[in-house]
């Protein structure tokens, strides 16, 4: 059934825009250039406002997810990477559940990727329609059908640009993937802004600077009681404070420390005697994939809940999914879940919130750990990184595990890989929860994504440097 399903949508995949694979080896400096161009296009789209919107001042239901989804309110990047990640989530789950089957041949993999792109474009249109019809840019009846259609077209074209930019990097023209690049850029930008923002905010305590570090110097310069000024700079509410910044740096250090955890399995050449090597199985075997898929799941739950609560606010089942409240303390207006599944699947605002509602905190912890472990185990089966796939790769390279025959390699790898995937997913979820409870800037999920992505780029750079021999050869 699976192959038949992919064959059915094959004609549609053939008409999709596609980036051709490079016909020659792309030099590192060219990859850096293409990566920079991709990032520049993304950042420009983040600043171009949507044409035709009447207002974007209403409470933002996705304020808490925008850092992770690389989206920017009221701009061409309104949807961010949400459509492409959501399509990936759906396709991976369908493949993992064996509803559709993906063969090992390059043709089947290409067809699967094409189907994922097709669903990404369909989801882009669907999300654009939902955003417009739920009144995020003004009352649709007042804007008129023409303006609504123009906004939907803009969001669709921007979503297509994101898909193609991601494909450009993944095909080998640049470094890493577009999704990772956009997420890391957005999160790092948020952290720097929250630390050094010169924007002033009127609070009950008077006018304060948004940036935590600038606020520290401002409070010390303007307050006569220096001890109280320091206390306020470290613990002020509803605005970034120094404790948030310290928590962010601490989480960065912890995640980098855990990146070094791995098990090295001894392997040897089946052809050349005396040629030994190791195959590393990292603690974060599936890297940041579990947290990206978990974020996609929650963001789509938010979209559905917001859409239904706008139309059927008094319905019992709708309220069971999520009830929302608007808040504008210390920043732009935003909608926050206060009940239902959406509330329990969202992180507590602070450690004090954990003590106030331990049931919420407990359910959130179980959800994060369980979903990350599940997505991690599912991912290895559909991404070509399961024990069977690794054994096949080693066999193709004419390598075998020391002390084991080729036939027993899969059994031996099965002792490590599924465990590393599940436990690594649990650790990813646990670190995200810890960062949320500590109040790290950009959310626990965001910090975790930023660190793992930056570390991936560091590994790419080290690998390229070892192949080229020197820094000068890399760039010149």
Swiss-Prot record:
A cellular component annotation (GO) from this entry: endoplasmic reticulum membrane
GO terms (BP aspect): pronephric nephron development; protein targeting to ER; protein transport
Keyword Calcium: no
Membrane-topology annotation of the record: Multi-pass membrane protein
Segments on the Lumenal side according to the record's topology features: 54-76, 139-144, 194-240, 310-354, 442-445
Residues passing through the membrane, by range: 34-53, 77-96, 118-138, 145-165, 173-193, 241-261, 289-309, 355-375, 421-441, 446-462
Pfam families (alphabetical): Plug_translocon, SecY
SUPFAM superfamilies to which the protein is assigned, alphabetical: Preprotein translocase SecY subunit (SSF103491)
Function: Component of SEC61 channel-forming translocon complex that mediates transport of signal peptide-containing precursor polypeptides across the endoplasmic reticulum (ER). Forms a ribosome receptor and a gated pore in the ER membrane, both functions required for cotranslational translocation of nascent polypeptides. May cooperate with auxiliary protein SEC62, SEC63 and HSPA5/BiP to enable post-translational transport of small presecretory proteins.
Family in the record: Belongs to the SecY/SEC61-alpha family.
Binding partners and assembly: The SEC61 channel-forming translocon complex consists of channel-forming core components SEC61A1, SEC61B and SEC61G and different auxiliary components such as SEC62 and SEC63. The SEC61 channel associates with the multi-pass translocon (MPT) complex.
Protein name: Protein transport protein Sec61 subunit alpha
Organism encoding this protein: Gadus ogac (Greenland cod)
Origin organism lineage: Eukaryota, Metazoa, Chordata, Craniata, Vertebrata
């Amino acid at each position: 059934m699976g192959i038949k399903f992919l064959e059915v949508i094959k004609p549609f995949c053939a008409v999709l825009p596609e980036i051709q694979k490079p016909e020659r080896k792309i030099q590192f400096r060219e990859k850096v250039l293409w990566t920079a161009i991709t990032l520049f296009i993304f950042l420009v789209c983040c600043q171009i406002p949507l044409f035709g919107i009447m207002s974007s001042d209403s409470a933002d239901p996705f304020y808490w997810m925008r850092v992770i989804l690389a989206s920017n309110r009221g701009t061409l990047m309104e949807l961010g990477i949400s459509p492409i990640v959501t399509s990936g989530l759906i396709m991976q789950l369908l493949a993992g559940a064996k509803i559709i089957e993906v063969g090992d041949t390059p043709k089947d993999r290409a067809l699967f990727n094409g189907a994922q792109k097709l669903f990404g474009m369909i989801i882009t249109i669907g999300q654009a329609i939902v955003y417009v019809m739920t009144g995020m840019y003004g009352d649709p009846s007042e804007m008129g059908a023409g303006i609504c259609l123009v906004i939907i077209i803009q969001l669709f074209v921007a979503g297509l640009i994101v898909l193609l930019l991601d494909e450009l990097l993944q095909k080998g023209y640049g470094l890493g993937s577009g999704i990772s690049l956009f997420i890391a850029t957005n999160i790092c930008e948020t952290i720097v802004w929250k630390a050094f923002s010169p924007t002033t905010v009127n609070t009950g305590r008077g006018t304060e600077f948004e940036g935590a570090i600038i606020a520290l110097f401002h409070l010390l310069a303007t307050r006569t009681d220096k001890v109280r000024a320091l206390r306020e700079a470290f613990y002020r509410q509803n605005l970034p404070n120094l404790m948030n910044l310290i928590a962010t740096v601490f989480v960065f250090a912890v995640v980098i420390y855990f990146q070094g955890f791995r098990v090295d399995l001894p392997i040897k050449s089946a052809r050349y005697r005396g040629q030994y090597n190791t195959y590393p199985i990292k603690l974060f075997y599936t890297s940041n994939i579990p947290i990206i898929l978990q974020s996609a799941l929650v963001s789509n739950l938010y979209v559905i809940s917001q859409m239904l609560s706008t139309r059927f606010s008094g319905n019992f089942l709708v309220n069971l999914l999520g009830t929302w409240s608007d808040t504008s303390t210390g920043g732009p207006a935003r909608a926050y879940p206060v009940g239902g599944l959406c509330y329990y699947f969202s992180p507590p605002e602070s450690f004090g919130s954990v003590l106030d509602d331990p049931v919420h905190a407990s359910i959130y912890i179980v959800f994060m750990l369980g979903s990350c472990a599940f997505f991690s185990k599912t991912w290895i089966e559909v991404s070509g990184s399961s024990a069977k796939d690794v054994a096949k790769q080693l066999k193709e390279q004419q390598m075998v595990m020391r002390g084991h025959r080729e036939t027993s390699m899969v059994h031996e790898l099965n002792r490590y890989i599924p465990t590393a995937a599940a436990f690594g997913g649990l650790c990813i979820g646990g670190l995200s929860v810890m960062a949320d409870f500590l109040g790290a800037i950009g959310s626990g999920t965001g910090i975790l994504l930023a660190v793992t992505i930056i570390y991936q780029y560091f590994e790419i750079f080290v690998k390229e440097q070892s192949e080229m021999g020197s820094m000068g050869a890399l760039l010149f």
